[in-house]
């Protein structure tokens, strides 16, 4: 990071950090943006050291500008960052990124006018391309520089690591900037695997070549001296044309950009391959119940890049489906933000949803609702399991226990009042299973009837039959005594009720 931090001097760094990212926005450029730009340039096989000078930034802008129409958001952000850095190097006062882009556009228009004026003064109106890999040597001839092994290695590495994910297309566009059809075929031939995808790409190229031949028929008659023949579809694809013919078409006046045409065909085929390798539709991307909102947004935009739709349709998908397919927790938060909320505000609001803190808050809210409902039931008298009031053994008052009693501690046993033992060891008046003190010297145990009440009115039998009913009962008692002489209960439970 130290080397990347040396891109700007102290004074230039102060100016850099005063420039805003957007007009009227609060965020400003920081050192991390330069670090990110240098890493992106390394990923695109471009020397990050070019950022240290204004001329290097101008070269980077010249390579990135043709890809802005078909490039990704990362490519546009890289272009904007380098453009702003160029203004800082050139000591051009700008307030935000938009103003820096306007300054770059003005400077490019001025340079074009100067070049046209110089060509008119010298009598040479031919606008010769100076773009890499076609350069002009010291003799003024246009020569071709073969694509470097480093570029090929970067392309093969991307295909091996990413297969045919959506980010492969902007990577191919950046690596093939200014390339001839022969260079593009070299890049395609270095792909060893994924032959099914390569076959699909060949079919797309053949279809586009046939469409080119249909729209651009060959003019009848001989070719004028000094003029080149018109390229056919197979010539643009590099199968029936030589390298010198390709350079001639690209540097002719007016030029025929066979390299850019062939590149568009390849990108069209790559889009079909990306759609095949990413079968998931944007409509199927939904946030899981425990998935962080950040991971859901990453999956959403990755699938959105593979969708073959216009930018207006993609904007509608983002505004509608991103909120609609979120989980209930995030959807509630996003709807509360309103339709004009930015992605940064959405991610900040849903940052903790699904994590332990959010779960704890939801659980606390649920518990508070349950507690409130229980309180309402108790107030209405529907709560039956009311706790019994406790009573203190020390002071005899209710509402607290002896452990929390503030009264002076009573000495001795709390049950019998004697000293020398505690209540748990007290043997005074220990109750048996019948609920009374045992042994008892007062007759029968407590669960027996102590006295039988005598009836105050004669029974129904005595009223009906008179003395006939009373005589057998009087005779039955001595018979029972004679048959069961040992049946007295006195020996077991004290006084026998039959002997009373």
UniProtKB/Swiss-Prot annotation:
Further remark: HIV-1 lineages are divided in three main groups, M (for Major), O (for Outlier), and N (for New, or Non-M, Non-O). The vast majority of strains found worldwide belong to the group M. Group O seems to be endemic to and largely confined to Cameroon and neighboring countries in West Central Africa, where these viruses represent a small minority of HIV-1 strains. The group N is represented by a limited number of isolates from Cameroonian persons. The group M is further subdivided in 9 clades or subtypes (A to D, F to H, J and K).
Protein known as: Gag polyprotein
Renumbered ranges of motif Nuclear localization signal: 26-32
Residue ranges of the region described as Disordered: 106-128, 438-482
UniProt key word Repeat: yes
InterPro entries for this protein: Gag_p24_C, Gag_p6, Lentvrl_matrix_N, Matrix_HIV/RSV_N, Primate_lentivir_Gag_pol-like, Retrov_capsid_C, Retrov_capsid_N, Retrovr_matrix
Modification type Asymmetric dimethylarginine: residues: 387, 409
Annotated organism of origin: Human immunodeficiency virus type 1 group M subtype B (isolate YU-2)
Region annotation Dimerization/Multimerization of capsid protein p24: where it falls in the sequence: 277-363
PTM (free text): Gag-Pol polyprotein: Specific enzymatic cleavages by the viral protease yield mature proteins. Capsid protein p24 is phosphorylated possibly by host MAPK1; this phosphorylation is necessary for Pin1-mediated virion uncoating.
Stretches the record annotates as Interaction with membrane phosphatidylinositol 4,5-bisphosphate: 73-77
Chain positions of motif LYPX(n)L motif: 483-492
Similarity field: Belongs to the primate lentivirus group gag polyprotein family.
């Amino acid at each position: 990071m130290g080397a990347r931090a040396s891109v700007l001097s102290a004074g230039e760094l102060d100016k850099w950090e005063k420039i805003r990212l957007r007009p009227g926005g609060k965020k400003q450029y920081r050192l991390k943006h330069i670090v990110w730009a240098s890493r992106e340039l390394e990923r695109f096989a471009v020397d990050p050291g070019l950022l240290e000078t204004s001329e290097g930034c101008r070269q980077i802008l010249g390579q990135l500008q043709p890809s802005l129409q078909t490039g990704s958001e990362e490519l546009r952000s890289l272009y904007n960052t380098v453009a702003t850095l160029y203004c800082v190097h050139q000591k051009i006062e700008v307030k935000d990124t938009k103003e820096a882009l306007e300054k770059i556009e003005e400077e490019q228009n001025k340079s074009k006018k100067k070049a046209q004026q110089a060509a008119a003064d010298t009598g040479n109106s031919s606008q010769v391309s100076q773009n890499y890999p076609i350069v002009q040597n010291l003799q003024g001839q246009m020569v071709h520089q073969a694509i470097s092994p480093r570029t090929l290695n970067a392309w093969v590495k991307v295909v091996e690591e990413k297969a045919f994910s959506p980010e492969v297309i902007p990577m191919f566009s950046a690596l093939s900037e200014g390339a001839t059809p022969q260079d593009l075929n070299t890049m395609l031939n270095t792909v060893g695997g994924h032959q099914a995808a390569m076959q699909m790409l060949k079919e797309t190229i053949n279809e586009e070549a046939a469409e080119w031949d249909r729209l651009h028929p060959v003019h009848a008659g001989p070719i004028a001296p000094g003029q080149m023949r018109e390229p056919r579809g197979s010539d643009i694809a590099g199968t029936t044309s030589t390298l010198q013919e390709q350079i001639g078409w690209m540097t002719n006046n007016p030029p025929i950009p066979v390299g850019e045409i062939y590149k568009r065909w390849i990108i069209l085929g790559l889009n079909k391959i990306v759609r095949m390798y990413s079968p998931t539709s944007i409509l199927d991307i939904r946030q899981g119940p425990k998935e962080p909102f950040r991971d859901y947004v990453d999956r959403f935009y990755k699938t959105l890049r593979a969708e073959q739709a216009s930018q207006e349709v993609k904007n509608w998908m983002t505004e509608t489906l991103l909120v609609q397919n979120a989980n209930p927790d995030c959807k509630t938060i996003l709807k509360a933000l309103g339709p004009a909320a930015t992605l940064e505000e959405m991610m900040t609001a849903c940052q903790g949803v699904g994590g332990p803190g959010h779960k704890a808050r939801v659980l606390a809210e649920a518990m508070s609702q349950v507690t409130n409902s229980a309180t309402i039931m108790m107030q209405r008298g529907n709560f039956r399991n009311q706790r019994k009031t406790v009573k203190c053994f020390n002071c005899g008052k209710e509402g607290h226990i002896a452990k929390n009693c503030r009264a002076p501690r009573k000495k001795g046993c709390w049950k019998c009042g004697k000293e020398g033992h505690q209540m748990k060891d007290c043997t005074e008046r220990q109750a048996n299973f019948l609920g009374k003190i045992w042994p008892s010297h007062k007759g029968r145990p407590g669960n027996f009837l102590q006295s039988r009440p005598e009836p105050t009115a004669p029974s129904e039998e005595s009223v009906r039959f008179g003395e006939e009913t009373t005589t057998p009962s009087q005779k039955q008692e001595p018979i029972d005594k004679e048959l069961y002489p040992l049946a007295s209960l006195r020996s077991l439970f004290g006084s026998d009720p039959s002997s009373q």
